[in-house]
Amino acid sequence: MEPADLSNLRGRSLRASIRGSMRGSIRENSNSIWRNNGAEVFSRSARDEDDEEALKWAALEKLPTYDRLRKGILFGSQGAAAEVDVDDSGVLERKNLLERLVKVADEDNEKFLLKLKNRIDRVGIDFPSIEVRFEHLNIDADAYVGSRALPTFTNFISNFVEGLLDSIHILPSKKRQVTILKDVSGIVKPCRMTLLLGPPGSGKTTLLLALAGKLDSALKVTGKVTYNGHELHEFVPQRTAAYISQHDLHIGEMTVRETLEFSARCQGVGSRYEMLAELSRREKAANIKPDADIDMFMKAASTEGQEAKVVTDYILKILGLDICADTMVGDQMIRGISGGQKKRVTTGEMIVGPSKALFMDEISTGLDSSTTYSIVNSLKQSVRIMKGTALISLLQPAPETYNLFDDIILLSDGYIVYEGPREEVLEFFESMGFKCPERKGAADFLQEVTSKKDQQQYWIRRDEPYRFITSKEFAEAYQSFHVGRKVSDELKTTFDKSKSHPAALTTQKYGIGKRQLLKVCTERELLLMQRNSFVYLFKFFQLLIIALMTMTIFFRTKMPRDSAEDGGIYSGALFFVVIMIMFNGLSELPMTLYKLPVFYKQRDFLFYPSWAYAIPSWILKIPVTFAEVGMWVFLTYYVMGFDPNVGRFFKQFLLLLLVNQMASALFRFIAAVGRTMGVASTFGAFALLLQFALGGFILARNDVKDWWIWGYWTSPLMYSVNAILVNEFDGQKWKHIVAGGTEPLGAAVVRARGFFPDAYWYWIGVGALAGFIVMFNIAYSVALAYLNPFDKPQATISDESENNESESSPQITSTQEGDSASENKKKGMVLPFDPHSITFDEVVYSVDMPPEMRESGTSDNRLVLLKSVSGAFRPGVLTALMGVSGAGKTTLMDVLAGRKTGGYIDGSIKISGYPKKQDTFARISGYCEQNDIHSPYVTVFESLVYSAWLRLPQDVNEEKRMMFVEEVMDLVELTPLRSALVGLPGVNGLSTEQRKRLTIAVELVANPSIIFMDEPTSGLDARAAAIVMRAVRNTVDTGRTVVCTIHQPSIDIFEAFDELFLMKRGGQEIYVGPLGRQSCHLIKYFESIPGVSKIVEGYNPATWMLEVTASSQEMALGVDFTDLYKKSDLYRRNKALIDELSVPRPGTSDLHFDSEFSQPFWTQCMACLWKQHWSYWRNPAYTAVRLIFTTFIALIFGTMFWDIGTKVSRNQDLVNAMGSMYAAVLFLGVQNSSSVQPVVSVERTVFYREKAAGMYSAIPYAFAQVLIEIPYIFVQATVYGLIVYSMIGFEWTVAKFFWDFFFMFFTFLYFTFFGMMTVAVTPNQNVASIVAGFFYTVWNLFSGFIVPRPRIPIWWRWYYWGCPIAWTLYGLVASQFGDLQDPLTDQNQTVEQFLRSNFGFKHDFLGVVAAVIVAFAVVFAFTFALGIKAFNFQRR
């Protein structure tokens, strides 16, 4: 971290603490913010004042208070003083002011904070402070145990039924109670930095959430938490304290500056203004003249409008984010800032607020140790000087960061094992018989000493036999330790509430007024709409294409007004127009869902209420609706031959505006209720279906059953369609009466559909739609206010954990005995392997020059990322690949492993002396990716069996394969977790550290000779990192070649490596060689370079090495470390080694395999199908929800269209029956297609890893993915067919039921395969859903229901035959009714003749229809397979 980062950080933390404490009362809160921000200002107050400046101050002092607080003295670049209105200060003024205040952060920040404190102390204003106490805190959760914890199809149903019965007290729940925190008590004191340590699953996050007042309501809590003696219900803890999550949730389209500025504006000025007024009054009374820069800064930071800008700029500088301030934060779809920067944005977002107490959860993930040190040091200065309160959990704090803390809280298995001064924690453990080794970081020791696996190595009482001391025993011993007794005595003394500063605790729910909240949210929504303009333009363009198609299908020259049939075509056209405009609002659903996680976070932090978020998302979409509907109506109205009256033209425009707004509001509401794409799309389909089927067009009002008539009257679509029909058919051109008629043709057409032909129904429709718009938007706001997100981490206990007698937490590997892994390393493995070395000489990797660099004047065609890199990795030697960010560590590893998908590679790479060939190399190598990509719905054991099945040679029988899998599980200590579900990261399943070990094991079961590991310890705490490194070490000791990239390791992790390959920025090596005992060879090499500072005793050699080889050190010393290395004896020895290993040994031969893959095609298919079986069976969110949805829809259709299959005496009866088929095909088909897309998308990321590892070819994978759907869709079609066929009353003959089942089964199938295909040919799920959505619309238009085939213009009829829904509808209708000779009472035709003449359906064509529908399914499945094989959207 740069010096500026540190300073920035400090100030920001300072400001946060200050604000928090002051905001509780009236205004002093703001003081704190001021102090933070003003701090740097104070560092300038040594300036001598000239006479002119004195005169200006005198003039300011004479102003009224309000004006005086809005004017300040600002110094220009020449040093001249000028009076400035704070409201008018611009970007340049703010920038100059900050430049003067924050010069060199590391040097000036503390001075600045002290000066700020002195200014406030000088006039006798007190800083508020908060002491947080928690007493006898117990937190319990309910969890399923063992196999019931797996989310299988049957468990999903059982849990659902059980939960229902439990809620009405019929049957008790089978959940087991799990205690997360066990009777914990303690004090977090102001002015002191407290570090929270503990292994994963120990309850750290739960404790932080409990203290911040943000616990999930589902947890059972006893005990109490107090701030300055006040319980949480007495004030607003969410605004008094800031909880900084370990998860980085931000809106990707906003820049870093905009993200922080929005947060600052929402959290408000707090009490800064009142504090400043009091400060100014006292200074005036005491005739004290403040520093001009500080005064200006404080005034800007307490002025509405200016405050957010000034505070944000300051925080950006302190956090070192000023270099990326105007860069998008980014997400999966948008390239943005790095992970470490994103982590700092998460911290900054809360620190710009006025909270005085900070609860920070793993804020250092992804940061290097120097940046973490800088941030924590700044927080420490702020906390000490400004009386802040901070409890911070860190994963792997380096010794220098650990030493910044005053107090330690050590959690283990829900117990507080130690809480007290840092200096005395080691004394406590020594009193228990455990000592921290000399070269061991104290933080690492503390996290390992309570672990069953690690504890014994620290036992020092050689005269006593060792036994495992449980966390409970430690906690009991701590109570009698002198530190524990002191804390206990303090807790017995109640905090005197009268001593609590009135500004310490906040009682106002929101930081700013209602009008300002609405303004801030509106401005952000407008910004996001501008950033997402492409989406709106794309929607507009898509609507334009559909409009052009629609107007050419319903072309005015083909649209006569001579008969009821003609009226039917107009009705179909108008119905489609309404449906099209309504479905255009569907895009609100994914856009709303996408922003919900950030909304929930900000809502829970009380940034704004739900209505302030909901209103702008409604109002600002109205102009978009105007543009879209305007384009549609102006383009299509006259071309389609609607009534030429201009009044009716504008009435249609108004109506469609309201339809679009109603639909948008409805989909926003559904998104807020559904909260996940799966649930929301299911709800959405359900709501649409009710509207669609009961909208009066598909099923006429007279035919709606009494039990569904309520749905007809509450369907917005009914009012929309009735109004648009009345608007058209009440026109002059429809007033004539046809032969045999008794009323005008227009009225007859409307009445035939069961609608109301009276003109006033247009205005009833308009009024109803306006009412629905208001109702849905209010419901949307209410849903946002009261519903919480679904996807929260789920508590599960494995069978092994349940059976374990240990006191330790069931979720953690350390609870299991297991030294067998270390014993195995000397025995060798069940399966032999050939050791291989890898050498590379003068390797150069380059890519095409990025366009932006070309534009900046670079003339080279290629950008070189690796420059002539050479080295050798040998069997049984563990090599660390290290370097600063941008050094090319991962790039080198990807090049060697053959994982690069682009670029140019030059140089020599050899395997045991033979040139490397990627197809054979993939068979003997493994690559552990940093991202831990695994199928979420299989267990640990199944993941390993699957990998071994596909990657071990064919001659390894099943018994040996299973033995090898067991051995590997033992080696990486996964045996206790064999039945644990892998799960989704951060939601359920394995912890981060367990996933890392699974990644290693998945590669090990392939029995590779060479293994590459990318950052195997990143994101882990010290104890977890030690477990992973032990697994890595065990792997190397079996004689394999292992290379790891590693980021800022602790001393003992670093010294677990045998050799180091150190690179500098620009892709060049600067040290390649052995580490030696206690890194002696490495230290000797660099200390021999003149000017390099010597390492301090006990200092981490890895940290020292990166510090002394930084580019700034190169410049300071005037050397190039690459040149020094290439002139050294070490380099010459390495080149000799490379030459030696580049020659094949006698008696060896080049790698050769008879086939590309380890297993034959059929075995690949079976293995992939086996995994897909478990993935589907354990994914009830997809499989069970789809079946339940289908069952509900079937029951709805059955009751809605009850017995209509037996009535075919009228034209309308046939239309009703067709309508039931059309609606079912469209809705269930689209639901199948949409719901399969996220499933395939998640599995495709796993597929990319497995394919790169050479596990199988793309075709078996695609075959399995296609095949696994068939049984589930068979069940779906059977359930639907039996329910609907019997309830609708179709004719019970074997042939007719078979045809109905056949067409529905293959329709569900081709829709599902179509959804899979769209994912395979597009880069991500979002694009796939957009592409699919376009096709749904076109298929709907050409389905043959809205416009029968004979009425489609000849120039479009060809597409009818290319529309799968048209073929399905043809098959369903022709098979049921195409052979009926019954006469229709309102037609002079039989049913068969009517279907032939009006729809072109022929019963004897069924065989062809069946073949075509099967062909659609086959073509879509085949295209899916080709897409998976041909397209790789992963870029490396």
Swiss-Prot record:
Originating gene: PDR1
Residues passing through the membrane, by range: 534-554, 567-587, 622-642, 653-673, 679-699, 707-727, 764-784, 1184-1204, 1214-1234, 1270-1290, 1301-1321, 1327-1347, 1358-1378, 1408-1428
Lyase as UniProt keyword: no
Residues involved in ATP 2 binding: 883-890
GO molecular function, one term: ATP binding
GO biological process, one term: defense response
Domain of life (superkingdom): Eukaryota
Tissue expression: Roots, petals and leaf epidermis, where it is confined to glandular trichomes (at protein level).
Binding residue positions for ATP 1: 198-205
Residues covered by the ABC transmembrane type-2 domain: 516-729, 1163-1377
Name of the protein this chain belongs to: Pleiotropic drug resistance protein 1
SUPFAM superfamilies listed in its UniProt record: P-loop containing nucleoside triphosphate hydrolases
Keywords, in A-Z order: ATP-binding, Cell membrane, Membrane, Nucleotide-binding, Plant defense, Repeat, Transmembrane, Transmembrane helix, Transport
Induction: By terpenes such as sclareolide and sclareol, and by some phytohormones such as jasmonic acid (JA) and ethylene. Strongly induced by compatible pathogens such as the fungus B.cinerea, and the bacteria P.syringae pv tabaci, as well as by non pathogenic bacteria such as P.fluorescens, and P.marginalis pv marginalis. Weak induction by incompatible pathogens such as P.syringae pv syringae (at protein level).
Subcellular location: Cell membrane
Stretches assigned to the ABC transporter domain: 165-438, 838-1090
One Pfam family from the record: ABC2_membrane_7
Family: Belongs to the ABC transporter superfamily. ABCG family. PDR (TC 3.A.1.205) subfamily.
UniProt biased composition (Polar residues): 810-821
CDD domains: ABCG_PDR_domain1, ABCG_PDR_domain2
Function recorded in the entry: Excretes secondary metabolites such as terpenes. Involved in both constitutive and jasmonic acid-dependent induced defense. Confers some resistance to sclareol and B.cinerea.
Membrane topology designation: Multi-pass membrane protein
Region (Disordered): 796-826
Entry GO CC: plasma membrane
Species this chain originates from: Nicotiana plumbaginifolia (Leadwort-leaved tobacco)
InterPro entries: AAA+_ATPase (IPR003593), ABC2_TM (IPR013525), ABC_trans_N (IPR029481), ABC_transporter-like_ATP-bd (IPR003439), ABCG_dom (IPR043926), ABCG_PDR_1 (IPR034001), ABCG_PDR_2 (IPR034003), P-loop_NTPase (IPR027417)
